[in-house]
């Protein structure tokens, strides 16, 4: 088969549960997947090791790690050492301190540039508006606006090669995401979700992300393979 017939996609891969599921979905849809991860100064750097491993084991065509210093900007518990990672439970009525200013816009822009170079029309990202309703850059209207911008601001878009921002998880609960991944053979023991995982990827068990992950497995009726430092 000629390369022109290959469906290519850029998949944002953090190394976490959601993005690993998105990669499996894209592959199940027949895309040749090119994964992209970001070393942006985050606390939980173990996710980068997980992302490389997931990409390799899944058979992704290529994997890239983009480096940027969002730690120098700060403003988030994930990038600013002066802001503690919350461990008291998920706040539903406010934007949480784990929101990283403009992160998805920055990440999608790198993915968009790569997609243009690869002549890929599709970008997959694991944003979710159900469990993380407080994140402004996880909302459907944000994705729609970004896709519109992508088609206005790129050579591909101007020449009629419409760019698509694919968000297959956006309306799913964490339990539904896990159930989908299990059906597709995702090995969740290889993923890292914790906001403050240690260098080996061991999860704290008490941050918002760990709480959502544990609850998701419980609601899905699936055994959680994660090793948690705390049973809270």
Swiss-Prot record:
Purpose of the protein: Catalyzes the ATP-dependent conversion of 7-carboxy-7-deazaguanine (CDG) to 7-cyano-7-deazaguanine (preQ(0)).
Entry's cofactor comment: Binds 1 zinc ion per subunit.
Residues involved in Zn(2+) binding: 194, 204, 207, 210
Protein encoded by which gene: queC
Keywords: ATP-binding, Ligase, Metal-binding, Nucleotide-binding, Queuosine biosynthesis, Zinc
Cleavable signal peptide: none
Annotated family: Belongs to the QueC family.
Catalytic activity: 7-carboxy-7-deazaguanine + NH4(+) + ATP = 7-cyano-7-deazaguanine + ADP + phosphate + H2O + H(+)
Cofactors named for this entry: Zn(2+)
Documented EC number(s): 6.3.4.20
Residues noted as binding ATP in the record, renumbered to the chain: 13-23
MF terms (GO), sorted A to Z: ATP binding; ligase activity, forming carbon-nitrogen bonds; zinc ion binding
SUPFAM superfamilies: Adenine nucleotide alpha hydrolases-like (SSF52402)
InterPro entries: QueC, Rossmann-like_a/b/a_fold
GO biological process, one term: queuosine biosynthetic process
Record's protein name: 7-cyano-7-deazaguanine synthase
Domain of life: Bacteria
A matching Pfam family: QueC
Organism: Hydrogenovibrio crunogenus (strain DSM 25203 / XCL-2) (Thiomicrospira crunogena)
């Amino acid at each position: 088969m000629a390369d022109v017939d290959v469906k290519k996609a850029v998949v944002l891969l953090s190394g976490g549960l959601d993005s690993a599921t998105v990669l499996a979905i894209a592959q199940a849809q027949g895309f040749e997947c090119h994964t992209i991860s970001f070393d942006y100064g985050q606390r939980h750097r173990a996710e980068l090791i997980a992302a490389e491993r997931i990409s390799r084991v899944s058979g992704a065509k290529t994997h890239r790690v983009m480096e940027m210093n969002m730690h120098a900007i700060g403003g988030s518990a994930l990038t600013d050492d002066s802001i503690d990672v919350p461990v008291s439970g998920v706040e539903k009525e406010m934007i949480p301190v784990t929101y990283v200013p403009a992160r998805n816009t920055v990440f999608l822009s790198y993915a968009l540039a790569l997609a243009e170079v690869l002549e890929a029309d599709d970008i997959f990202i694991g944003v979710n508006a159900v469990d993380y309703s407080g994140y402004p850059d996880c909302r459907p209207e944000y994705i729609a606006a970004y896709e519109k911008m992508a088609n206005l601001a790129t050579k591909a878009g101007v020449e009629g090669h419409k760019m698509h921002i694919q968000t297959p998880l956006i309306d799913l609960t964490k339990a539904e995401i896990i159930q989908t991944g299990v059906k597709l053979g995702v090995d969740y023991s290889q993923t890292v979700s914790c906001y403050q995982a240690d260098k080996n990827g061991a999860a704290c068990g008490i941050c918002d992300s760990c709480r959502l992950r544990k609850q998701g497995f419980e609601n899905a009726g699936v055994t959680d393979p994660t090793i948690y430092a705390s049973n809270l």
